[in-house]
Curated annotation (Swiss-Prot):
It comes from the Eukaryota. GO terms for biological process: nucleocytoplasmic transport; regulation of apoptotic process. This is Putative uncharacterized protein ANP32CP. LRR repeats lie at residues 44-63, 64-84, 85-107, 111-134. Residues 163-226 have a biased composition (Acidic residues). It comes from Homo sapiens. The gene is ANP32CP. Residues 161-234 are annotated as: Disordered. The keyword Hydrolase does not apply. PANTHER family: ACIDIC LEUCINE-RICH NUCLEAR PHOSPHOPROTEIN 32 (PTHR11375), ACIDIC LEUCINE-RICH NUCLEAR PHOSPHOPROTEIN 32 FAMILY MEMBER (PTHR11375:SF15). The lineage of its organism: Eukaryota, Metazoa, Chordata, Craniata, Vertebrata. The keyword Repeat applies. Belongs to the ANP32 family.
Length: 234
């Protein structure tokens, strides 16, 4: 489908000014340019234009875009002028071979996240560290977090693994604490059961002693009776 027809289809009877997201992936671009996308899309915040033969974004209107997914061979200098509010830029699979191609992105002061997956530039030595040196405003590169004050790009994975280990350690401590609580509760229950057994055992002994006393008393009475009868016979 041609890009113009695709835009008309995505409008769904809405005015361009009411549209905040627009996905034009796989729509054909006549002469490799954007078409039918005008500054009437004044509230547009997300635009995706992947595949479809786009070779230039020189006719991109000025927009409030915050997120842009783009498959284009060059001309990124246009973005700083036309989309100054960009915070997320996805350029995966583009023919970007060196850092000079993305150097114009320095002008995007609000840019926080950049994706260059499957671009040749990612094969350069110290690729990540050099990108962050070039684009100081970035926080994420290829979905990896970066803190300019902490560690070099090469240590990001170790940093993330360390966070995972800390979380596991916290979970283990919580488990140990819970296990200790359970053990303490079980110990208290055993002590209570032991006390109950002692009490019941004591009661049983008292009852046995009482019964023995009754038997002895009866035997004594019988002996006294026999003695009295013997004396009377005499």
């Amino acid at each position: 489908m041609e890009m113009g027809r695709r835009i008309h289809s995505e409008l769904r009877n809405r005015a361009p000014s009411d549209v905040k997201e627009l996905a034009l992936d796989n729509s054909r671009s006549n002469e490799g340019k954007l078409e039918a996308l005008t500054d009437e899309f004044e509230e547009l915040e997300f635009l995706s234009k992947i595949n479809g033969g786009l070779t230039s974004i020189s006719d991109l209107p000025k927009l409030k875009l915050r997120k842009l997914e783009l498959r284009v061979s060059g001309g990124l200098e246009v973005l700083a002028e036309k989309c100054p509010n960009l915070t997320h830029l996805y350029l995966s699979g583009n023919k970007i071979k060196d850092l000079s191609t993305i150097e114009p992105l320095k002008q995007l002061e609000n840019l926080k996240s950049l994706d260059l997956f499957n671009c040749e530039v990612t094969n350069l030595n110290d690729y990540g560290e050099n990108v962050f040196k070039l684009l100081l405003q970035l926080t994420y590169l290829d979905s990896c977090y970066w803190d300019h004050k902490e560690a070099p790009y090469s240590d990001i994975e170790d940093h993330v693994e360390g966070l995972d280990d800390e979380e596991e350690g916290e979970h283990e401590e919580e488990y140990d604490e819970d296990a200790q609580v359970v053990e303490d509760e079980e110990g208290e229950e055993e002590e209570e059961e032991g006390e109950e057994e002692d009490v019941s055992g004591g009661d049983e002994e008292d009852e046995e002693g009482y019964n023995d006393g009754e038997v002895d008393g009866e035997e004594d009475e019988e002996e006294l009776g026999e003695e009295e009868r013997g004396q009377k016979r005499k």
